[in-house]
Structure formats: structure tokens, C-alpha cells
Amino acid sequence: MDKKGDWLIYDKKGNVIPVAQGTDEDKSVTGNGLPKFTGSMTHNFTYKNFDLSVAFRGAAGFDIFNVHDFYFGLQSMTTNQLTTAYSKNAHITTGKNVITDYFIEPGDYLKIDNVTLGYTMNLNKKYIEKIRLFGTANNLYTFTKFT
């Protein structure tokens, strides 16, 4: 950004110019929205009549365009909650919103996807040999650097 708060970009020759002087030839493809790696794993544990299952899921090697920061500015600003839903974009002081790589962030994540804890009771009744009680929680936590 320049001193007035306008975006600066690189033109096709590599020179820094104001965004208003940019042309279609100066645009370039930046980032990759498709993960290079995806994976998941499940761990099962048992002890006596208890059982525990923990499932993880993740992806790595991709980028995300942070639309919230692009349109609304920093999400952490709460000084104007009663008048508007979001603060003015602190990154853009003049001109229009411009899509730049400034708003591209790493999309890598590891998620605790599912945890199930169960207990099996041996009843040894005529029609019911065992009964299992369990509780499950989904989408427990996501480890990521994406804001």
C-alpha cells in the first residue's frame, strides 16, 4: 500500500504500480484451492467394558482466500457492535476492494472429527445378551492457521 492507503501491485514487467493503473495483462493466477494431501485416521481403544474411538481428518498444501477480511476488515474489531455488523475494512482506506494475494492464507488443517465413548453391559438375559450405551461428539476442534 502507498501512503494514501491505496493498493500497490506488480505489473507484468515486475514494476510496482498503483492498482488503478493495472490492466488485465498484469493479473496472474495465485494460490491453489485444491489440497495436495488429504487424510484421515481413526484410533480405537478398549479397556474392560469401555471403548473409545477418536477420528481425525485433515488436508494440507492448499490456500484459502479470506473473504471475511476482504469485505469486512478485521474480525477482531468489536467497537461498533451496536451500529453495524462489521468494521470498515482497515486494510483499504481509499478506492475499491481489490483482490490481491494479501488475503490468501494457508488452508492446512487437522480436525478432531469424531469422539465416541461407550460402555457395554453384559445382561445375560433371555432375549438381551448385551447392551451398549455411548455418547458421540462431532466436529470437536480444528487446528489451523487460517483466520
Which residue stretches match the model-derived regions?
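Outer-membrane beta-barrel transmembrane strand signature
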Residues: 1-53, 94-107, 112-114, 118-123
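Extracytoplasmic gating/loop element in the C-terminal half of outer-membrane beta-barrel translocons
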Residues: 2, 15, 59-140, 146
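A composition-driven signal for long, intrinsically disordered, charge-rich low-complexity tracts
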Residues: 35, 140-141
